[in-house]
Amino acid sequence: MRYSEMFLPTEREIPSDAEVVSHQLMLRAGMIRKLSAGIYSYLPLGYRVLRKVEQIIREEMNRAGAQEVYLPMVQPAELWQESGRWEHYGKELLRFRDRHDREYCLGPTHEEVITDLVRHEIKTYRQLPKNLYQIQTKFRDEIRPRFGVMRGREFGMKDAYSFDADEEGAEISYQKMFEAYKRIFARCGLRFRPVEADSGTIGGSFSHEFMVMADSGEDGLVFCATCSYAANLEKAEVHPPEKMEISNDEMLLLTEVHTPNARTIDEVCAFLNVTPQEIVKTLIFNADGNPVAVLVRGDEEVNEIKVKNYLKCQELELAMDDMIQDVTGAPRGFAGAIGIKKARILADYSLLNMKNVVMGANKEDYHLRNVNEGRDFQISAFADLKVARETDSCPRCQGALKFARGIEVGHVFKLGTKYSKAMGASYLDKNGKEQIMIMGCYGIGTGRTVAACIEQNHDENGIVWPMPISPYQVIITPVNMNDKALAETAERLYESLAGKGAEVLLDDRDERAGVKFKDADLIGIPIRVTVGPKKLAEGKVEVRLRDTGETSDVQVDSVEKMILRVIEGKMSESYLIF
């Protein structure tokens, strides 16, 4: 491709509304342009990268035995009503009516559509297993789209769905996709880590996220320094302390203390001269309309996802003031466990050995000292309900936990029968008995993968593309197109390399060399060949590698072999898994 013919509007200034590096560089490098909030057009350079990511995905999905389909983006409401998600999905689901007043939505995901397709076509165990995938546009009406294509409203996704006759087959399908995802992200040149994750609105029994390691990542991830345990922060478990018996002699006299206007942990600590570790926080939650009291140590935070999963409720939120008043008899800020009769009381493992702690008195402007579980109140159950911290131990081996930031680019779910049972996706087994299919689903954000790659591969000058997904492999830069010798040498190299299968961009613009070099660095092409008068007089050109900055002067008649060798080497580097 000739630069002069390409639609490639680069920018020098950093866009003021771009918060993260990938958004800034995708705009500056002429990869995308914003149409509306969370909705972007891909320009030729960006689309080349996107297509390369999609091609890697297709190759690995096909290799794993999946078959590509293409499903409608517009989905009828009745399918979502069958699955039960029409009521529960929330405002991210864009709903509308057609001219006949029939309700539809723009698909944020395709579990309902694929289940409907399969239930009508698969009737017997002989037709199983099946794994169907597509690369399609999705729409989620995010309340706050941000970070460019990282969190847009309209976005591309590869979603696959497996259907199996039994749990054993479903596990095999899950592992095939898990391994395929590792190959996909490795081939894209990403440093990544699979982590245990919550299944969220998709549902299912368990899932893994594939996290690209990046300091700018929205998601926290936790991993063990000793064993292979890894999870996102929402899912991360901690090893509970060993339960110790507390004798009656150790329990001090329960005392009520006047604490005017001391509502927060910091305020109570200052007023009573205690540490947060000596305080029990009592949070009242509304779980599907029912109050639940959750206790956690004062220096810890409640993990609402863990609470929701423990209770197996559909909706969980912090209680409003009227529910808190009804349950505790006091306003917000003075809740405690003693005397609560209208709510279950759950406690985090961090309180297993609590002794003589401070707690709200369920009375405005009062707290209690020397509270002891068992003597003063009863707990319904202890569970892992807090957000993991670096001081916690690995739930598998008790090793030290490490924390990092990451960007979720893929998610694999074992759905079980959540959708197949609700929508009647069944088959006849070997004995002619009707059985429900076991499902899995597997998603990759295609544009998100591109953005995550930039977050991980850039410097102060621009993008540093891994070879496998770079829009071009080589950029040839004659410093002066009006110099006949330089122009002819650049043309010959361009034609020769392109003829050997290399993807080459020839910068044939009538621009200063400095402008060309800045643009080459900005768009991140891995190999730059500079054709200049001094080197050419010696029969040489300069070859520069974008990732290392290494330069070498190479004879014109041998530069082609050298470049092809570098391309081959850098393509194979991508198979290293973090």
UniProtKB/Swiss-Prot annotation:
It is found in: Cytoplasm. The keyword Signal does not apply. GO terms for biological process: prolyl-tRNA aminoacylation. Disulfide bonds: none annotated. Coiled coil: none annotated. It comes from the Bacteria. Its EC number is 6.1.1.15. Keywords: Aminoacyl-tRNA synthetase, ATP-binding, Cytoplasm, Ligase, Nucleotide-binding, Protein biosynthesis. GO terms for cellular component: cytosol. It catalyses: tRNA(Pro) + L-proline + ATP = L-prolyl-tRNA(Pro) + AMP + diphosphate. CDD domains: ProRS-INS, ProRS_anticodon_short, ProRS_core_prok. Belongs to the class-II aminoacyl-tRNA synthetase family. ProS type 1 subfamily. Consists of three domains: the N-terminal catalytic domain, the editing domain and the C-terminal anticodon-binding domain. Catalyzes the attachment of proline to tRNA(Pro) in a two-step reaction: proline is first activated by ATP to form Pro-AMP and then transferred to the acceptor end of tRNA(Pro). As ProRS can inadvertently accommodate and process non-cognate amino acids such as alanine and cysteine, to avoid such errors it has two additional distinct editing activities against alanine. One activity is designated as 'pretransfer' editing and involves the tRNA(Pro)-independent hydrolysis of activated Ala-AMP. Homodimer. This is Proline--tRNA ligase. The lineage of its organism: Bacteria, Pseudomonadati, Thermodesulfobacteriota, Syntrophia, Syntrophales. The gene is proS.
